[in-house]
Amino acid sequence: VRLTLDGDWTATTTDEPLRSTPRFDFPGQCVRIAEYADVEGWQRFLGETFGSQEWLWDAPDELRFDRAGRELVGAGFRLPYECAAAEDSARVPVTPAVRPGGLRADEARDFRLDVATELCRAPGDTELTCLRDVDVLDEPLEACIGIASDVALLVQHGTVVGWSLTDPVRYLTTGFAAPDPASPSPAVRSLFSECLDLVTQPLLDQVRGRDPAALARLRAADETLRAQREDRRRADALLSLIGNLVED
């Protein structure tokens, strides 16, 4: 299947998804899928590959391809700050089923992959679906390409219109660190939903506006995270951002 990612920039699907474990950097509000483990490794990776990447003040999503075989070798997606209305999130299609696969660029040149603007949250935040805009929900999806474990590109009319992350709590981390391989605790799953409320619109505006009720929720989340004993690495990932908001 041939996909359009930016104007006349196209790629063809393959049967080889990425083998790297996704990393949901909660303080950075982004999902990374690649082998690098620090900033220096990331910069080397960008120099050795082509595709979509940050440049100066422009920060699109990342899809990176190797120069030899033009195969997809890494990805990075930014989480939108704007939560879709509940009625829109309820319209996120459950079909078609995710088909594991990769991408091969049709030519070796850079392009720009726009970030998603709408965050659709499934009940219990079991899945996060990030869309170009809510108009995508007016028509069915053509394909869901599972480019990595629990990460899929969403395709409509031959164009990538968004991405999804299933079981996001499992992949929580900070920076470039690998996520905890153990299963998430029920307590941290619940705290994740509360924290995601606090760092996305509309509640984020209330926090920044110093609304008393919103600040009370923020401080309660901060205290609960600090007291959390099990699943400490994921709790610390959440606390990295929540603690900063409290200090601000």
Regions found by a protein language model. Give the residues of each.
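N-terminal intrinsically disordered, cationic/polar leader segments
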Residues: 134-142, 151
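Intrinsic disorder/low-complexity detector
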Residues: 1-50, 54-56, 61-65, 75-131, ...
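Short, surface-exposed charged micro-motifs
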Residues: 62-64, 150-154
